[in-house]
Amino acid sequence: IPRPIGWISTVDLEGRDNLAPFSQFQNVTFDPPIVMFASNQNSLGERKDSVRNAESTGQFVWNMATYDLREAVNISAEELPHGVDEFERAGLTKLPSRLIKPKRVQGSPIHFECTYLNTVRFPGASLMGTVDVVFGRVVAVHIDDACLTPDGLVDVLKIQPLARMGYYDYTYVDNQFRMVIPGNNEAVLAGLEGSPLRARAATGGER
């Protein structure tokens, strides 16, 4: 089953940049906007840089992985020593963020700047040890204008987001269809749209 990729950029306390993709990434809620990514330990039994950096600095960026960026995503997945810059290794250009310190990936069409909320640790049964599930609140969103439709919606077919499957397999979005659930419950429809303003209006205004 395809899963969105958490291409997470962070910076450590010494100012060294880090970039890594995670197969377990998802939005948790849209109001407030919260996302999560899950990370096993590395092959040495250590917590990964992305987790440690997010916890120590309180910040991370999600960069949308796309079909055009697939090779760079794969290169940035390699397990490397602490302090190695995956941006440079993958030949990527860095963009400054607006509110936080971690850099963004130039060429990625959408970025979420996130502030760290908390980590939930689960015991792991594999050789990779425990699993860290990191939660963050989205404080800024960047969307490339070239990836918007005339109506101001994200053109997913143009972006071609990359998704992780099983084994060594990936896929990308090249087809979509639209369905609206029956009924006229405005609060439910607003929730499905992911529209905070419409949801608040449908439930009695600002909260």
What is the predicted role of each segment?
Residues 1-207:
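Basic, polyanion-binding surface patches
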